[in-house]
Amino acid sequence: MSTYLQSSEGKFIPATKRPDGTWRKARRVKDGYVPQEEVPLYESKGKQFVAQRQAGVPPGMCPLVAAESKKEREKQERTRAKKQEKESGRQPKAPAPGVLVMPPSTCPPPKVSQQQQQQPSGSRDINSISKAMEDTLKLDAPQEVVDPAKQLKKLRKKIREIEQIESRIQAGEQKKLDKDQLDKVKKKSEILRQIKDLESTPRS
């Protein structure tokens, strides 16, 4: 913020020293001049309206009047709340408007057979679910029979893949195996046994 000195000629900015040691001349300030740093920032009407809303003051209303009316409104709300508390303490709570209050049911409970009474509800549910699952499994069970020739072809293909992996390792082309390749190599003996079993089984 600029510091002004007053003289008989009016306001003026005093002489100041520059960093290199030279002096700036004193400058006279014209009447009504406002320095740039003191000029208020421009705000659009929309920004002013938002600021007034956040402050809780309606546009064009005096802040003092708004503060007084706010205090009065808060006082009335507190009085009303106290009055409602007193009334609610005296009277029983009435049902909310639009809510239908049903009288206690006079219908007799449904009859339960002696067998159902003896059996716990949890076990009844488990039995019914397990029975339904058994029926579903019976219906969904695959009826097809795997062709031994096709199975043998698939197994021989797997063995060829395993042998290719082993030959690449021996040749030094591949040093590290991924998870699938490791699984294939581990299953080599099992696949060979399956091939042997299928070859020894007489074909129909």
Swiss-Prot record:
Compositionally biased residues, Polar residues: 120-130
Oligomer status and interactors: Interacts (via N-terminus) with mago and tsu/Y14; the interaction is direct.
Family named by the database record: Belongs to the pym family.
SMART domains, alphabetized: Mago-bind
Task of the protein: Regulator of the exon junction complex (EJC), a multiprotein complex that associates immediately upstream of the exon-exon junction on mRNAs and serves as a positional landmarks for the intron exon structure of genes and directs post-transcriptional processes in the cytoplasm such as mRNA export, nonsense-mediated mRNA decay (NMD) or translation.
Composition skew (Basic and acidic residues), residue ranges: 68-90
Example of a GO biological process term: nuclear-transcribed mRNA catabolic process, nonsense-mediated decay
Lineage: Eukaryota, Metazoa, Ecdysozoa, Arthropoda, Hexapoda
GO CC annotations on file: cytoplasm; exon-exon junction complex
Name of this chain's protein: Partner of Y14 and mago
Subcellular localization(s) per the UniProt record: Cytoplasm; Nucleus
Domain of life: Eukaryota
Coiled-coil blocks: 149-181
Organism: Drosophila simulans (Fruit fly)
Any matching Pfam family: Mago-bind
Family annotation (InterPro entries): PYM1, WIBG_mago-bd, WIBG_N_sf
Transmembrane spans: none
Disordered, as annotated region: 1-27, 52-142
Keywords in alphabetical order: Coiled coil, Cytoplasm, Nucleus
MF GO annotations: exon-exon junction complex binding; RNA binding
